[in-house]
C-alpha cells in the first residue's frame, strides 16, 4: 500500500463529509489489498469501511447532522483518508463517553452482528448462540452484545488466553486443543444451541448443523476455512427444521444499511452509553504504519479491533 495525496471528496445531497480522526481495519481491507475482494462499481479504490471523526459539511437534504458533530459511520469505502464522504443514513453520533478510536471500531462489526444475529438469525433473549472466531472484531462484538441482551453465549477461540478474556461474556473453547462440537454437546447436555454465527464456512458446515437445536439457525458470514461444504447432511437439516442463511454487508443497499443504523441507535446505543458493551481495541497505529496494522490483523493474534489514527 502507498499513501498519496488526493482530492477532498465532494458530497451528494444525502451525504456528509467527515474529517476522519480514526478508522477501523477489517479483513475485507486485507482481501481488497490482495486483489481478492472486488469493490462495488463506482466506489473509491481507497480501503476503509468504518470511520470516526467530525462532520465538516452536510448535503442539501441532510437534516440529522450539522458541521461539528462527532460521528462514526459505515462507509462504502475510502475510510483510510483524512476526509471521507458517507451517506448520512450510515452515520451515527458517537456514543457518549467513547473516544474517536473506540467509535471507529463500532460500525462494521456492530452493523454486521445486528444484521446477521438479530435480523437474519432472529436470536431472542433466553436463547443460546455459538460464535466462531470469538476473539475477532465481529466475535468480541457478538459475545458482548448477546450477553448484554440476555442470551447464553459460547465461542470458539484459538488461544487459552482468549478464553480468559472472553469469560465475562461467554464460555469459550480452544478449537485447537478441543473438539468444539464435543464440548458444546457437553455444555448443553447434547441439546445444542439456537443460533450459530460462523466465519469458517465449508469445513464446519456439518458439525454446525449437528449442534443446532430444532428450528435452529446457522448464519454464515465468512468462509475463511473454505467456501465449499462437501457432503452436506440434508437429513439433519430437514429433521432439525434448520435454517441456513448468510449475508455480506458491503453489497447491501443504502436503504438497508440505514435501517440497520436506525435499529442500532434504538437498541444498541443505550447499551454502549451505559457501558454494558464496548468495542475492544487490541492495537492502534498511526496512518503511516498502515502496513503494520494490516500485519497485526492478519496474524490472528489480536483480541478485538485494530484501528488507525490520522494526524494533521
Predicted regions and their residues:
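NAD(P)H dinucleotide-binding glycine-rich loop of Rossmann-like/cofactor-binding domains
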Residues: 31, 42-44, 70-135
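Glycine-rich phosphate-binding loop and adjacent beta-alpha segment
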Residues: 149-152, 157, 203-276, 309-312
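N-terminal Rossmann-fold NAD(P) dinucleotide-binding loop
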Residues: 139-140
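Short, glycine/polar-rich helix-capping loops at beta-to-alpha or helix-loop-helix junctions
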Residues: 79-82, 157-165, 229-233
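Short, well-ordered loop/turn sites that connect or cap secondary structure elements
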Residues: 65-66, 123, 212
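C-terminal capping/lid region of NAD(P)-dependent oxidoreductase domains
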Residues: 269, 274-283, 291-312
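Glycine-rich beta-strand-centered segment in the early N-terminal region that forms part
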Residues: 7-24, 36-78
